């Protein structure tokens, strides 16, 4: 396939799924990429070697969502169309015992699955993926037993004692797809139900987000609906609750700015949680402000006929991209760019502040359904006091000496520090591929272009790059020598707009 000069080109093509890829996410400090397909298969890829390190069939239907749980990244959450949400335990130390046979390769024996920690029966009628929010509470085991199941379901925010990892899961209600259920892990109890936001039925819930607001300190839920509207709910503040007025969910914001169903939403990953962005079946990418309040909103009309919002102060910013059907929107953790997967087979990169398109990633011939954006990591934060790097469940690397990295260490550091974007979909051919593009490679100078003809003699020294390991001949992979065409593919990448390493 010809690619326009200067356009972002794939750095790696990972092939292994036999059906369209519906979910993708970078985990463990960018050292792993997890993908899931239409038949329920999950593949955990190593970004260091670009190979699958764990393969299993998590669900009997299409994957709707994946997530990472736990301080050490040992928990993997999968949500399938088979009405199951499963939390698996797969620490890095157990990856060697997992199957490496990819879904496209059929085998007679069943592949080993990770240990199952929890299974939750959920509603998947509307294809809405779960939302999750980790919490850390202090639990006294003796008091835990005395309080019983009812109080246990209230999370015990005032308990004191031993620390315990817990999780909140938000999914559409089992009976009515316009309301939201929130479950507590590990008790599996439903602790909250949020009803439909108003008398006008907005249709099915299409996308969810769940978090604790940093200013109000209250649990907050954002939902996108089939009619193109969004609602923001906040649990009433503990300081305002009385015996006669128990906790309740207030709708603090509403807006209807999409003219087609909302397909995805992503919340500001920064500490302040100031905004969120949505994409839909229409051509609009919309940015909304999140009110820092728990007070119910007062409806008012905006200047736009298609928009009803809580106040003109929070009127959304609308970008008409002229490209309908963008889903899987994800904001990078530095809050500077957002990426979408398009039905037209294109992934698009947007600048969040100015809400403008920066780049179009073109590779797939048919629709793209999933996108993942690697975190921008702070190297200084991940190094210990003596200047050495370490490795843990999040993927930090172990270096043999101060200031020294061997070949493996360089590959691991590159995997962690590169600004990757992974795009998955259906190519119209087998096997299905995941397109991983690098956003921070510097432009190639003219002098380098003039000397590329002499680079072949230096190829054996460039084995650490392995720019196309999946496509490289087996003998080249084994000896570390990469043929010239693969080196050219790696060297030919251009920077994308203003999203370089200094952004």
Swiss-Prot record:
Belongs to the WD repeat ASA1 family. It comes from Sclerotinia sclerotiorum (strain ATCC 18683 / 1980 / Ss-1) (White mold). The gene is asa1. One of its GO terms (biological process) is chromatin organization. Its main location: nucleus. It is found in: Nucleus. PANTHER family: GUANINE NUCLEOTIDE-BINDING PROTEIN SUBUNIT BETA-LIKE PROTEIN 1, TRANSDUCIN BETA-LIKE 3. Component of the ASTRA chromatin remodeling machinery complex. Component of the ASTRA complex involved in chromatin remodeling. This is ASTRA-associated protein 1.
């Amino acid at each position: 396939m010809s690619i326009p000069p200067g356009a972002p080109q794939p750095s790696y093509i990972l092939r292994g799924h036999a059906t369209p890829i519906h979910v993708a996410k970078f985990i463990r400090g960018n050292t792993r990429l997890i993908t899931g397909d239409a038949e329920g298969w999950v593949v955990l890829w190593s970004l260091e070697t670009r190979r699958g390190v764990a393969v299993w069939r998590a669900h009997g239907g299409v994957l709707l969502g994946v997530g990472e749980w736990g301080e050490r990244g040992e928990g993997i959450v999968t949500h399938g169309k088979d009405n199951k949400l499963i939390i698996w335990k797969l620490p890095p130390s157990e990856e060697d015992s997992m199957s490496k046979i990819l879904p496209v390769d059929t085998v007679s024996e069943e592949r080993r699955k990770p240990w199952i920690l929890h299974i939750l029966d959920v509603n998947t009628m509307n294809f809405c993926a779960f939302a999750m929010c980790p919490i850390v509470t202090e639990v006294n085991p003796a008091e835990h037993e005395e309080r019983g199941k009812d109080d246990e379901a209230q999370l015990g925010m005032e308990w004191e004692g031993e620390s315990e990892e817990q999780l909140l899961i938000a999914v559409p209600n089992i009976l009515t797809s316009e309301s939201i259920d929130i479950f507590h892990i590990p008790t599996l109890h439903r602790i909250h139900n949020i009803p439909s936001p108003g008398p006008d039925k907005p249709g099915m819930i299409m996308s969810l987000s769940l978090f604790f607001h940093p200013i109000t300190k209250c649990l907050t839920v954002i939902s996108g609906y089939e009619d193109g509207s969004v609602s923001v709910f906040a649990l009433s503040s503990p300081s305002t609750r009385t015996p006669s007025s128990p906790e309740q969910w207030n709708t603090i914001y509403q807006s209807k700015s999409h003219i087609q169903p909302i397909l995805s939403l992503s919340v500001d990953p920064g500490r302040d949680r100031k905004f969120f962005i949505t994409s839909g079946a229409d051509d609009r990418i919309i940015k909304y402000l999140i009110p820092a309040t728990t007070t119910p909103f007062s409806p008012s009309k905006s200047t736009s006929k298609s928009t009803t919002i809580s106040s003109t102060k929070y009127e959304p910013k609308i970008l008409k991209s002229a490209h309908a059907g963008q889903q899987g929107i994800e904001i990078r953790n530095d809050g500077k760019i957002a990426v979408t997967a398009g039905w037209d087979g294109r992934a698009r990169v947007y600048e969040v502040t100015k809400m403008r398109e920066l780049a179009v990633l073109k590779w797939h011939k048919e629709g793209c359904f999933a996108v993942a954006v690697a975190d921008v990591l702070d190297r200084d934060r991940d190094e210990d006091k003596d200047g050495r790097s370490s490795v843990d469940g999040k993927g930090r690397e172990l270096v043999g000496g101060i200031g020294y990295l061997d070949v493996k260490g360089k590959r691991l550091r590159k995997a962690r520090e590169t600004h990757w974007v992974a795009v998955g979909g259906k190519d119209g051919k087998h096997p299905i591929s995941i397109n991983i593009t690098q956003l921070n490679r510097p432009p190639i100078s003219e002098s380098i272009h003039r000397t590329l003809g002499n680079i072949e003699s230096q190829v054996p020294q460039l084995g650490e790059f392995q720019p196309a390991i999946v496509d490289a001949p087996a003998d080249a992979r084994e000896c570390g020598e990469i043929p010239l065409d693969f080196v050219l593919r790696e060297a030919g990448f251009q920077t994308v707009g203003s999203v370089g390493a200094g952004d």
